[in-house]
Amino acid sequence: MWRGIVCGLLAGAFWGAVFIVPVLLPDFSPLELMVGRYICYGVLAAALMLPRLLPLLRRLRRDDCLAMLRQALSGNVVYYLLLAYGVKLAGVAATSLIIGLLPLSVTIFGRKDHGALPLRRLALPLLVVAMGIACINLDIFSHAGGAGTDGASLAQKLLGVLCAVCALACWTWYALDNARFLKCHAQVSAVEWAMLYGLASGVIALIVGAVVLALQQAGAADAVPTRSWSQFWLVCLLLALGASVVGNYLWNLASRLVPVTLSGQLILSETLFALLYGFLYAQRMPRPLEWGAMVLLAAGVLWSVHAHAREESAGGEELA
């Protein structure tokens, strides 16, 4: 089990890096970052699947292709675009803490699929989470600056928080849709499917990138600042390789080696690493309200996971 825990923590370390990239490349818009990341991911996915790509594509039906496109949009393209805007406007800490609610949001909205606890049994964990969200919002709007905010105005910070919430909703929907799809389509493995919608994400990013490039060339009369495109593509390639390929592979290993209830807790490592990277970049310690938000949100999510673990254990004893 310890091997699985290490794999889960390493996956979180790779995934946490996605939150710091908008801060590392401030001269590039979230749209450009999304395009760069998923073009690189699409190329890597195609290269990794090359020997079996054509046979796999022939097995896909029209419904499979539609599912692949909608999951590429919800789980990759739109999700990361919203995340990057959240980081730019509200900062790394706020965005990572809000998206760190994923284990709880997937549990709540997927309760009919998994026979999870009724909401009334989750009232106290949800209250703790709400207190954590209140803390991080109080911190955002009472302090100027921070990793990723670039002196954002009140309206921009509000928009950043909204983007983070929408990113959370987007990935929650994707996670549930993906799980339901894989249960009903055993002919495609989880790894093959991840690579397929990675390839679809690359195609979408390529189309969006072509449109953005055409618009930029049409407005070429405006002065465009010199930007380090070599650094941009290097970071995007490392992000695609680390977060999208290696991170996902490590998480698949962890999922096989640890109990399901523990995997929900390991997802929090993504948030913790994102916070660590953000505070290291800003060269500061968390403020009191940020400490409070981290403790409350982690406690709320872990409380919920523990409640479900007890319910599963009780159900298993009854069946025995």
Predicted regions and their residues:
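Glycine-/small-residue-enriched transmembrane alpha-helix faces in small-molecule transporters
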Residues: 1-35, 144-182, 318-320
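Hydrophobic alpha-helical transmembrane segments of multi-pass integral membrane proteins
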Residues: 4-6, 32-48, 70, 124-131, ...
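Helix-helix packing/entry segments at the starts of transmembrane helices
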Residues: 12, 36, 76, 80, ...
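Specific transmembrane alpha-helical segments of multi-pass solute transporters/efflux pumps
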Residues: 17-18, 50-99, 135, 240-258
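Hydrophobic/aromatic residues within transmembrane alpha-helices
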Residues: 25, 33, 86, 112-117, ...
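C-terminal-most transmembrane helix of multi-pass membrane proteins
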Residues: 38, 138, 264, 268-320
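Hydrophobic transmembrane alpha-helices of multi-pass small-molecule transport proteins
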Residues: 45, 49, 118-143, 147-148, ...
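C-terminal transmembrane-helix exit sites in multi-pass transporters
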Residues: 48-52, 102-127, 134, 272-291
